[in-house]
């Protein structure tokens, strides 16, 4: 009888220890998820930025990588990638550097089609069209004969101009990853097609699937801030060997480069 009581007490102790440990891990995950959200929210809370020229007056995170007199540069990148089943992967997007020192913004509209040669090796067919921003409008720097490309540039909007992450704090049950050695971190969430940002993407792009996407927030560098780190936002609708549909976006603040 005494042995039974001791055994029962031992089992109870182990169960309590396991439960407390489990709660500890949950709290650690919850804490890291909160840290990741706060880190991303420093930039995402600025969305939507309808007039990108407002960024000339907005400063991001500064550290020792910046020269004393450097006001910094915002680097924006938005890109849509679509590969219908069995077809080539096509991407269309834009990169823009908004230099706060010179009050000028230049970049490229970039198209690419990934094809495969007879040995199955991927071949990039990337084309860049230099652009600049004037009066909050993106315009080509050089004359472009292709009317379709001209129209795409004139109608292009960065994700930062129409996205809204006011509900970021409400995203729950994320798949959290953190590696302090790199350092790198990420949080992934299952979204619904009713999500505001998903609806915005569907309005602007011909997305050939009704499948709701996963949202991935991934970054490198110190969670508290780093000018040499990056933060990327990805919406993945379909991911496979022969079919891929995803949208990627980033807005990072970095030291300015000499022209």
From Swiss-Prot:
Gene Ontology cellular component annotations, sorted alphabetically: plasma membrane
Keywords: Cell membrane, Lipoprotein, Membrane, Palmitate, Signal
Signal peptide: 1-22
Main localization category: membrane
Lipidation (S-diacylglycerol cysteine): 23
Pfam families: DUF576
Membrane topology: Lipid-anchor
Coiled coil regions in record: none
Cellular localization per UniProt: Cell membrane
Residues with lipidation of kind N-palmitoyl cysteine: 23
Family affiliation: Belongs to the staphylococcal tandem lipoprotein family.
Name of protein: Uncharacterized lipoprotein SERP2465
């Amino acid at each position: 009888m005494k042995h039974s009581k001791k055994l029962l007490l031992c089992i109870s102790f182990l169960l309590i220890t396991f439960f407390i440990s489990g709660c500890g891990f949950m709290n650690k995950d919850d804490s890291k998820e909160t840290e990741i959200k706060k880190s991303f929210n420093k930039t995402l809370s600025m969305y939507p930025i309808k007039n990108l020229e407002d960024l000339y007056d907005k400063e991001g995170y500064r550290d020792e990588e910046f020269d004393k007199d450097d006001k910094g540069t915002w680097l924006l990148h938005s890109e849509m990638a679509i590969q219908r089943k069995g077809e080539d992967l096509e991407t269309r997007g834009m990169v823009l550097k908004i230099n706060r020192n010179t009050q000028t913004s230049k970049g490229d509209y970039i198209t690419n089609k990934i094809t495969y040669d007879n040995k199955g090796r991927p071949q990039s067919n990337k084309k860049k069209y230099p652009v600049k921003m004037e009066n909050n409008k993106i315009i080509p720097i050089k004359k472009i004969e292709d009317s379709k490309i001209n129209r795409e540039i004139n109608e292009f909007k960065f994700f930062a101009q129409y996205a809204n992450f006011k509900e970021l704090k409400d995203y729950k049950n994320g798949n959290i990853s953190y590696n302090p050695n790199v350092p790198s971190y990420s949080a992934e969430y299952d979204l619904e097609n009713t999500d505001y940002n998903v609806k915005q993407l569907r309005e602007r792009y011909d997305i050939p699937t009704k499948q709701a996407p996963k949202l991935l927030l991934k970054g490198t560098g110190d969670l508290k801030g780093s000018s040499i780190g990056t933060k990327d936002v990805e919406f993945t609708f379909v991911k496979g060997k022969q079919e891929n549909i995803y949208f990627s976006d980033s807005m990072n603040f970095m030291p300015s480069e000499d022209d």
